[in-house]
Design a protein with these regions (language model features):
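Nucleotide and nucleotide-moiety/phosphate-recognizing core
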Residues: 1-161, 166-185, 190-192, 198-200
Length: 200
């Protein structure tokens, strides 16, 4: 399998942060988004950013900007689809997604996802961590996605499907278990941002 392309999902509305782009919030010497870029670019062949609205606000990052192709705010699957369409144009087989508001995700995210996908015709794997109540908790914005299923995903979104795990389960998606739940800590509130600073 060719090395996946990377797609950072930054299409959320950030309502609990007062709106705007969470990825552009300061963290350490950079931003949430720059932290995510630094971690992901070491693991993928090339990278793009899924975001809607004025693309010039991300110009400093020098990445292709992929807007959602499905009208309305329909959630992360629309960003996945935008990434799959971009990857298809590059001749790639798969993408790995990461969320722009989750700066501490594992540095071995991609190798673990690829390992979990061995033997799959259409590699489809979500990151997961141990959960005391549910056994495991899946992290649907962190996954390995096959370009071959992009038209099926488009049809599902046009039909109203929004929940990531419903679609992945329909296609026999697997989970890749990561031991550290804190690695998937995401910033949703000002308090979360303060905690992220303390975690540096």
């Amino acid at each position: 399998m060719k090395q996946p392309l990377g797609v950072i999902l930054a299409g959320g509305q950030a309502t609990r942060m007062g709106g705007g782009d969470k990825g552009l919030l300061p963290l350490g010497d950079g931003t949430l988004l720059s932290s995510v870029i630094d971690r992901l670019e070491q693991q993928v062949a090339d990278m793009a950013l899924n975001a809607n609205g004025d693309a010039t606000r991300f110009a400093a990052f020098d990445l292709p900007i992929l807007p959602d192709s499905i009208d309305g705010f329909v959630g992360p699957l629309a960003g996945v689809l935008a990434g799959l369409d971009w990857a298809a144009a590059q001749g790639a087989d798969t993408i790995v997604t990461a969320a722009a508001d989750t700066p501490f995700f594992p540095c071995d995210l991609v190798p673990h996802l690829l390992l979990a996908s061995e033997g799959m015709t259409h590699p489809l794997v979500l990151a997961a961590t141990p959960d005391a109540k549910r056994g495991t908790a899946r992290h649907p914005t962190f996954g390995l996605w096959p370009v071959a299923l992009r038209d099926d995903l488009r049809t599902a979104l046009q039909g109203g499907l929004r929940k990531v795990v419903l679609w992945t389960d329909q296609h026999g998606g697997r989970s890749a278990l990561f031991p550290d739940e804190a690695a998937f800590f995401n910033v949703n509130t000002p308090d979360d941002l303060a905690q992220a600073e303390r975690m540096l």
